[in-house]
Amino acid sequence: MSVKIRLTRMGSKKKPFYRINVADSRAPRDGKFIETVGTYNPLVTEEQVTLKEERVLEWLSKGAQPSDTVRNLLSKAGVMKKFHESKLSK
């Protein structure tokens, strides 16, 4: 089972809001997921991202692959840097 960290679209027409979910790669975009680890709101002037950093780092260490967009969001939040530092310190 390949696990991905990806965005799930919520909100209404023309007003998207996304949840950052951990899901099986075979599940549909808005389908079954394992855990919600954050949210992303692209419509506010400053893109608003909230994350459960400990849970994201745990899933990354277990081998979960972030999607391209989620990888960019995690990089901006500094989570990917922490992950790489913890990986190198082992």
UniProtKB/Swiss-Prot annotation:
Keywords: Ribonucleoprotein, Ribosomal protein
GO MF assignments: structural constituent of ribosome
SUPFAM superfamilies noted in UniProt: Ribosomal protein S16
Alphabetical list of Pfam families matching this protein: Ribosomal_S16
Biological process according to GO: translation
TM region(s), chain numbering: none
GO cellular component, one term: small ribosomal subunit
Family affiliation: Belongs to the bacterial ribosomal protein bS16 family.
HAMAP family per UniProt: Ribosomal_bS16
Protein name in UniProt: Small ribosomal subunit protein bS16
